[in-house]
Structures are given as structure tokens and as C-alpha cells.
């Protein structure tokens, strides 16, 4: 399903953006705190974008299942793998943001 593939790719891109901004915020925290704070806010905005994409990915799979349309085995295997990978990467990105906040954001 091309739509699901596109959503997975976009979610992955969004996670990379979250990590980039969060890592930059950590590096700039002492050197330029206002910019670091801005980067964390942008990372948090990307969290919202990621959550919307994730919601739609899950919705697509659930729609297929609810219509009694068998999700092709290959598609389910790919989805399961990609979904777990995205969840793990999301947790790592979220951790970077939370660590920054603990340091006094």
C-alpha cells in the first residue's frame, strides 16, 4: 500500500528532524540557551506532527482489518517491523527532549 509506505517514510523523516533539533539543543544549551530553547520547541512541534502521522498509519491498518479485508501477510510483516522501529526511535527522540527539560528548560 503506497499510502502506508509514504506515511512510514514521512514519519521516519520527522523523527530525524526531532532528533536533530533535540541534539542541537543539548549542544547549544550553555553556549546559546535562547536558541537551544527554540530548538526544543521545534522538536516538540515535530512530536505533534509525528503523532498525527502515526495515528493515520494505525488507522489505515485498522480500516483494512475492520472491512474484513485480509491484510496481505507481507504487508503485515513490513508494518509490524516498521511500526516497532518507529516506536523505538520515537521513544529515543522523546527521551532527548525530556532530558533537556530536566536540565532546566
Range-by-range predicted roles:
Residues 1-105:
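Iron-associated oxidoreductase/ferritin-like identity signal
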Amino acid at each position: 500500500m503506497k499510502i502506508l509506505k509514504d506515511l512510514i517514510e514521512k514519519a521516519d523523516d520527522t523523527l530525524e528532524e526531532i532528533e536533530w533539533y533535540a541534539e542541537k539543543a543539548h549542544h547549544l544549551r550553555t553556549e546559546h540557551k535562547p536558541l537551544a530553547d527554540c530548538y526544543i520547541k521545534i522538536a516538540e512541534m515535530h512530536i505533534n506532527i509525528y503523532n498525527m502521522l502515526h495515528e493515520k498509519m494505525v488507522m489505515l491498518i485498522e480500516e483494512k482489518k475492520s472491512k474484513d479485508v485480509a491484510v496481505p501477510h507481507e504487508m503485515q510483516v513490513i508494518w509490524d517491523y516498521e511500526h516497532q522501529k518507529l516506536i523505538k526511535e520515537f521513544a529515543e527522540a522523546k527521551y532527548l527532549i525530556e532530558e533537556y527539560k530536566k536540565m532546566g528548560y
